[in-house]
Amino acid sequence: MKPTTISLLQKCKQEKKRFATITAYDFSFAKLFAEEGINVMLVGDSLGMTVQGHDSTLPVTVDDIAYHTRAVRRGAPHCLLLSDLPFMAYATPEQAFENAAAVMRAGANMVKIEGGAWLVDTVKMLTERAVPVCGHLGLTPQSVNVFGGYKVQGRGDAGQILLDDALALEAAGIQLLVLECVPVELAKRVTDALTIPVIGIGAGNVTDGQILVMHDAFGITGGHIPKFAKNFLSEAGDMRAAVRQYIADVESGVYPGEEHSFH
């Protein structure tokens, strides 16, 4: 089996073929996801909440991400694997490069960082040194204390700022962008404006791809359930069928529906 590359996702965007991605944190689930057809996975700092039981992503360390990256890579050797750089792991370009190198050595193909135009120098530093970068705009969970909670971003005048940030990051060299919890109308503007693939979560069905936290897809999230989440396991009956249903619904545009979207 050939490894999945960013070129495949670029081709999907050009051909307007939606693609499904998911978070993964261990060998067994990564193997299951790969076997059922998911070719792109994210070792997200969401593991701080879903795996470690914290109330935010802030306690997650680079060592945590590297540990889970190694496990996922063993389970899905051919997937395109993205790994988060966690809170305060990229305060300077030099720090970002050191920590990105550790995560790449663990098996990541690309690192994801949260933030806007202030990250331009960091993105350039990484890409010039052969570290592919995925950006993340909108609701960026590492900034939860600044936002005052998990709220929809990019409404009103903030939408233009977000679009400008996306264009600046693309010009700096990011190869993917995650858009989280933004109005559908803004998600479409960003997706149309960028030449790189855009992956949405809580951004409607207008982005090139979708991502879900695996616990949300299986309905095993404790506490608050995000509006954009859907429990595919309740309809499918078993985990493998749930993954296949998730992929099919993303590719057809059925998911996310209006009930999962913001305006």
Swiss-Prot record:
Metabolic or biological pathway, per its Swiss-Prot or TrEMBL entry: Cofactor biosynthesis; (R)-pantothenate biosynthesis; (R)-pantoate from 3-methyl-2-oxobutanoate: step 1/2
Annotated binding of Mg(2+), by residue: D45, D84, E114
Cofactor(s) of this protein: Mg(2+)
Localization: Cytoplasm
Keywords: Cytoplasm, Magnesium, Metal-binding, Pantothenate biosynthesis, Transferase
Record family assignment: Belongs to the PanB family.
Record PANTHER family: 3-METHYL-2-OXOBUTANOATE HYDROXYMETHYLTRANSFERASE (PTHR20881:SF0)
Record text on subunit structure and interactions: Homodecamer; pentamer of dimers.
Protein's name in the database: 3-methyl-2-oxobutanoate hydroxymethyltransferase
